[in-house]
Every structure is written in structure tokens, then in C-alpha cells.
Amino acid sequence: MALGKRKRERQLDAFVASSDLPQSPGHPFYTALNRLLAENDFDSFVEELCAPYYASSMGRPSIPPGVFLRMTFVGYFEGLDSHRSIAWRCADSRSLAEFLGLGPADPTPDHSSISKTHKRLPKEVFEQVFQFILRVAARKGLLSGKKIGIDSTTVQANASMKSIVRKDSGKGWKDYTKKLAKEAGLDAPTAAELQQFDRKRKGKKVSNDEWENPHDPDATVTRMKNGTTRLAYKAEHAVDLESDLIVSATMHTGIAADTETVIDTAVDAAVNLEAAGSEDEVKTVVADKGYHSNKVMTLAEELNFETVIPERDTPTNRRWSDKEPATKRAVYNNRRRTKSERGKKLSRLRSELVERSFAHVCDTGGGRRTWHRGIVNVTKRHLMLVASRNLSTIMRMLCGIGSPRTLQGLRGLLQTAWIHIQSHVQPLKIDMPQWGGHIWIAVTDLRLTWSASW
């Protein structure tokens, strides 16, 4: 074999036959995912859903809704947190272009087009897409929803603390600090002196009643999990404790109290389950002690929700003389369920599954920080991340693989074989460059055969 040399200068071809264009064998995971979406007529559903928000005849054709939504799925599966990085990744991969339904000569959508499409479509479209994915799970018999676990986490906003201004005067933090320094006797302080004064002054507090970010007024000053103070939102998940599917994902301001949002999230989960065609209704709501209050216990019982929520530690015994009998009954019923063996088991299961959903969506899925502004746009992006995570869970339950990054090493080889066993596809050739050869995997009468050549 002769040595091939890379051409330093290359003259572009004027004409290229379509048969000479680069072809991709496709990625096994994305191929299986496309098959699942096609089985449920995903493209027809989203095209009909998005049609009212586009002109019926005039104008340049937009990104097909099915392509746009698949690109948001790619963002989750590849751990990409911005439209620019998603567009670059799709343009760089032939297997992803095939997943999007683009031919070898078709350009991938630009990141600006993705952003404009995201802004054009209302939140209701993203909510119905989220419900569609749940409906896919229900058709496969994977969705229950009788017992849900609820918890929340912070999502860092696309806004800086350095840009906050006072609501009454519109002055920034620096001007406000200069005013305080002048009142304290420091005339014309330098930047270093002003920074030192601000760091040492007592009673320093940033209240959301007095301060806001002009670029994203919906973001609030929030204490993050790591102890820092940032402008952020609060994402709340309700997870089906039997299937590990997220049945509700709501977004709130960073300072929204857990006790004020838990019932709304539980009701939203019930609505989504009904829209998905689930035969079961939400019966048990499991949460941590941060969600416990008399109001929550009473309202949950009125809505026929059984709560398993531990009580906060109190230094004194509770008094019931000034409370309604229904409130006392609801609190005691919750206490009995929480202390039972079943309640303890559900609490442990909630901690495992809900925290796992945050790890997948926010940490590995790129959702810990948002590049959108405004609670509506942030909600739309988070709904797509959660819908992608549900797709991942469905794929894992159907064929054992929930992520394209799972297909690595020997385990990935065996899981790839399982995908082809399930779908009865043609023999699959897997190149093994590190071994200097390839492996053929074939399915004949439900019997797996493989051979290697070097």
C-alpha cells in the first residue's frame, strides 16, 4: 500500500455527483430514536401543532418543526447548552444530519434561525410536545403516575449581579455604593477603596424588592447550592416513582417558596398524565420537609392527594386550638404515612429518582445555566430538556440504551447488538480501528451471530 499524502492546496470541484457525496451509516442510537418518533408520527403532529404560527403561503420556508425539535434533543444528548453549539455539532456530524432528515447536499440550520424559531413558538407548543413524549411512554405501557416525587433546584440566569439596578432610581450598584461611601465620609474614592468599603460595610443586603436586573427582570437574587449569590430561577420536577419519567417540569422565580409551588406542580403533573392518556391518576405526592406546611397539607387532602412529607423540627409542641379540625386531621394523616415503612421507602426512592433527574437535565444535559432571558423562554428550553430526558428514559427501557454516549467499549458493542435484535435490521458492520479490523453483527431468526475479520 502506498503512502497517502494530504493535499495542502485543493481546487474545489465545480460539479459533484450525488453518489460521490459523503454518506453516513448513521448512529445506532439516533437511528433507533428516529424509528420510535416515526412510529408515533412525530413530524405530522408537530407540523400541525406549529402551523398556526406561520404564514400559510407567502414567505421563505422555515426550519421544519421536526428538525428544530430534533436539534433541541441533540442539545440534551450531546450535553450542549447553547443554540450556537448545537448548530455547530449538527453541521459537523453526518450521522446527526441524517437524524435531522437532511441530505448530503442540505445545509444544517444556522444558530440564529434556531433562536428565532425558539422565540416564535409559544410556550403552549413546547408543553404539548412534552405531553406527546409522555403519550409515547403511555402507549408503550411505561407510564404510571400514581406516586410522584417532587423537588426543586436552581438554574443560573443569563444575567449578572454586576448589572443590577435599583427599582426606584434605576442607579446601578456602583453608583449606589459611591453614594453610601460619600455619606460615610469618603470623597472621590478610587475603585479599590470603593471595593474595600463595599466589602466591609455592615448591613449589606440585596433585596429583590429593591433591586432587579434590567436585562432579565424575571431573574431574582438567589442563594445557590454552593453558597454563592446569583441571579437565578427555580426548576421544579415531579417524577413518576415507578417509571422514572418526569411528568411535570415547572419554572419559578428563584425566591419562590417550595410550599407555594408544590401543589401547582402536582396539579400540573395530573393534567399532563391525563393529556398523555394514562389510565392512572396522581394519588401520592412525596417531597422533603421544605415542602411541609399546614396550608399544603390541607389543600392536598382537599384535592385527594396523599402526602408523604416529613415535618420540620420544632422546639415546642404544636398547638391546635387556633386551627381548623381539617388542618389537624391532614397534618396527622401525613405524619402517620411519613413514619410508616412505606413512607420511609417512598422518601428514599424520591431522593434517588428526583435528584437523578436534576443530574441528567441540569448537569450532563446542559441545563444548569440558561442562555435565554425571561421566565417564558427559560421555561420553553427547560421543557425540551426534560422531554429529551424522558425520551432517553423510554429508549433505555425499550432497548437498554438511553444516550448516544453509552455506545462505547465492549458494553456499547453488546448494546448495539441488542438494538438490532429488537428491530430485525440488516447485518451491521462495526469498524474497530484500534484492532485493525471490523466486526459483523447479524440477526437470523432471532439468533445473534457475529464474525470478525482482520
Label each region the model flagged.
Residues P64, W88-A91, G101-L102, P107-F305, ...:
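Polybasic low-complexity intrinsically disordered regions
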Residues Y54-P61, M251, H372-I375:
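A short glycine/serine-rich beta->alpha loop
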Residues S19, Q23, A32, K119, ...:
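Hydrophobic alpha-helical scaffolding
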Residues Q23-F73, E78:
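Basic, short loop/linker segments at the boundary and entry of helix-turn-helix/winged-helix-like folds
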Residues M1-Q23, L180, L407:
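Short, flexible loop/hinge motifs at secondary-structure junctions
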Residues L3-G4, Y53-V67, V74, E78-K119:
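Trp/Phe/Arg-rich N-terminal binding region typifying the photolyase-homology
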Residues G290-V376, G402:
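Helix-centered, glycine/charged polyanion-binding patches within enzymatic domains
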Residues T259, G343-G436, W440, L448-W454:
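Basic, amphipathic alpha-helical segments enriched in Lys/Arg and hydrophobic/aromatic residues
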